[in-house]
């Protein structure tokens, strides 16, 4: 499981010119699911995401977490995070999980992070062409792979 985390002042998802969801200050998470991902990958990432100290304290140091600031979260599925560009110029997505497995894991991830935050999170729609608007804060962008826990 792989995430791209972006600290935002606000973000939104639009589908077919209709606003689907939006958040204020918090995190926009792009979530990629791999074929062999499990609950332990979800648990690792959720704990890491909600506790990452990437928000500024009153001295301007990144010392506060999403939980500390009571921020919001928007989670968008992103199978292209597992793109392979090893051969040729057309990316291969063979490592990305098939929908039948990915959708339940995406829903579990969203439910688990919502529970960890004690609030409802916002989401995109799986397997749908979405327009994402965001205002980066910083910018701060962090990539985490549950299989590479550096």
Swiss-Prot record:
Transmembrane helix found in the keyword field: no
Enzyme Commission (EC) number: 3.1.1.96
Broad enzyme group: hydrolase
GO cellular component: cytoplasm
Pfam families associated with the record: Tyr_Deacylase
Reactions the enzyme catalyzes: glycyl-tRNA(Ala) + H2O = tRNA(Ala) + glycine + H(+); a D-aminoacyl-tRNA + H2O = a tRNA + a D-alpha-amino acid + H(+)
UniProt entry tagged with the keyword Transport: no
Motif residue range(s): Gly-cisPro motif, important for rejection of L-amino acids: 138-139
Chief site of localization: cytoplasm
Location relative to the cell: Cytoplasm
GO molecular function: D-tyrosyl-tRNA(Tyr) deacylase activity; Gly-tRNA(Ala) deacylase activity; Ser(Gly)-tRNA(Ala) hydrolase activity; tRNA binding
Keywords per UniProt: Cytoplasm, Hydrolase, RNA-binding, tRNA-binding
Quaternary structure, from the entry: Homodimer.
HAMAP family, sorted: Deacylase_Dtd (MF_00518)
Family the UniProt entry places it in: Belongs to the DTD family.
Function summary: An aminoacyl-tRNA editing enzyme that deacylates mischarged D-aminoacyl-tRNAs. Also deacylates mischarged glycyl-tRNA(Ala), protecting cells against glycine mischarging by AlaRS. Acts via tRNA-based rather than protein-based catalysis; rejects L-amino acids rather than detecting D-amino acids in the active site. By recycling D-aminoacyl-tRNA to D-amino acids and free tRNA molecules, this enzyme counteracts the toxicity associated with the formation of D-aminoacyl-tRNA entities in vivo and helps enforce protein L-homochirality.
Protein name: D-aminoacyl-tRNA deacylase
């Amino acid at each position: 499981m792989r995430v791209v985390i972006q600290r935002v002042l606000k973000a939104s998802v639009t589908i077919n010119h209709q606003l689907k969801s939006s958040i204020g200050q918090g995190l926009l998470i792009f979530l990629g699911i791999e074929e062999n991902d499990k609950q332990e990958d979800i648990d690792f990432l959720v704990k890491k995401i909600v506790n990452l100290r990437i928000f500024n304290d009153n001295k301007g140091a990144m010392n506060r977490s999403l939980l500390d600031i009571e921020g919001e979260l928007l989670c968008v599925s992103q199978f292209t995070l597992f793109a392979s560009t090893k051969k040729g110029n057309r990316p291969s997505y063979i490592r990305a999980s098939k929908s039948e497995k990915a959708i339940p894991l995406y829903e579990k991830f969203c439910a688990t992070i919502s529970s960890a935050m004690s609030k409802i999170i916002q989401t995109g729609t799986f397997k749908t062409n979405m327009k994402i608007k965001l205002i980066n804060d910083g910018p701060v962008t962090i990539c985490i792979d549950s299989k590479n826990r550096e």
